[in-house]
Amino acid sequence: VYVTGALGDAGLALAVAGGKTTVPTEHHRYVQARLERPEPRIAQGLALRGIASAAIDISDGLAQDLGHILERSGVGVRLDVAYLPLSPALIASLNQDAALTTALTGGDDYELCFTVPPERIAQLETVAAAWDCRCTRIGAITAEPGLRPIRADGSAFFLERLGYDHFG
């Protein structure tokens, strides 16, 4: 399981707008831009044709949107939260657990989340080397259904919610 770019910045901007947190002055413009002017990963999405086995844009939060792939595919994922790509702004603004939670549930990032079979990883690495954004492996598909966020020490990382729910 892979993602493009950095996660959680738009969610951080929403939290700032709602008066729930603040960001250091030097990161304010960046965070606001990530919410107001997200960069759609169109070129990356097109490049993934024939490589990715499933893909979705992250609009409702990584956990929520990845959950759609898992549900439709009848599989699960071990999500290594230590590998989540976090921006310097997110790291400077929140404690570690809050930053990870925001990256997992924040929404409005419009990055891509996608799965790649093992036999196509080398092809992905070649293609992604030319991208103008990061491509980060964050986990692995499992036969056991469900989303399992795991810390570096192997313990579970618990989420109170998965992300934005349009019907909740």
Where do the model's predicted regions map?
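Glycine-/charge-enriched secondary-structure boundary and capping motifs
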Residues: 28-29, 50, 55-168
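Short, acidic (Asp/Glu-rich) active-site segment that either coordinates a divalent metal cofactor
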Residues: 1-46
